């Protein structure tokens, strides 16, 4: 529908130790950080979907993004995985705010900390435990339209960025 190839990943498939600058100096970034950085860098557009923990992003997401921010291969500039691509954000929570507070923290980290281009459009799915049908589609028509709109903007922007 959106004319895009999609790669779904789970951060659980990229286990890493808690970021520690001393460990990085001693051993370099972990293999999974390099693999995740390469996965991000292989795509012109990245959609990050995450639950909310205590009004912020999950520790797993924060740690993964921190490690990826430290990976430099060859003559790459710092934060290469976050440059020259576009990010879109989504959250889901069983609360009534749908993870909206976590998106603030995630946006701040990506834009200010990593210099990433993050779309202003985002989606927060409230009451997430009951928000999806058995095929993982959003039940609420308004939320489904918003998700499609965010995805369409991500694809359109990524395609423009990828053009030589």
Q: What do the predicted segments below correspond to?
A:
Residues 28-114:
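Helix-loop-strand module that forms the ligand-binding subsite of alpha/beta enzymes
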Residues 7, 88-90, 123:
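Hydrophobic/aromatic beta-strand patches that form the interior of the parallel beta-sheet core
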Residues 2, 68, 110-113, 154, ...:
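Hydrophobic recognition helices of helix-based DNA-binding modules
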Residues 116-164:
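Glycine-rich phosphate/pyrophosphate-binding loop and the adjoining helix
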Residues 2-7, 116:
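A generic structural motif
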Residues 8-28, 131-135:
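N-terminal beta-loop-helix "entrance" segment that forms/cooperates
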């Amino acid at each position: 529908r959106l004319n895009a190839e999609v790669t779904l990943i789970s951060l659980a498939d990229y286990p890493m130790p808690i970021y520690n600058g001393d460990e990085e100096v001693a051993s370099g970034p972990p293999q999974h950080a390099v693999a995740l950085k390469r996965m991000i860098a292989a795509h012109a557009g990245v959609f990050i979907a995450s639950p909310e923990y205590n009004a912020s992003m999950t520790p797993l997401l924060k740690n993964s993004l921190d490690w990826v921010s430290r990976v430099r291969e060859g003559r790459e500039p710092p934060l290469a995985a976050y440059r020259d691509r576009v990010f879109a954000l989504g959250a889901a929570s069983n609360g009534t705010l749908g993870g909206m507070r976590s998106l603030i923290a995630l946006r701040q980290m990506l834009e200010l900390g990593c210099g990433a281009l993050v779309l202003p459009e985002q989606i927060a799915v409230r009451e997430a435990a009951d928000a999806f049908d058995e095929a993982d589609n959003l039940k609420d028509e308004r939320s489904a339209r918003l998700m499609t709109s965010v995805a369409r903007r991500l694809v359109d922007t990524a395609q423009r960025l990828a053009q030589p």
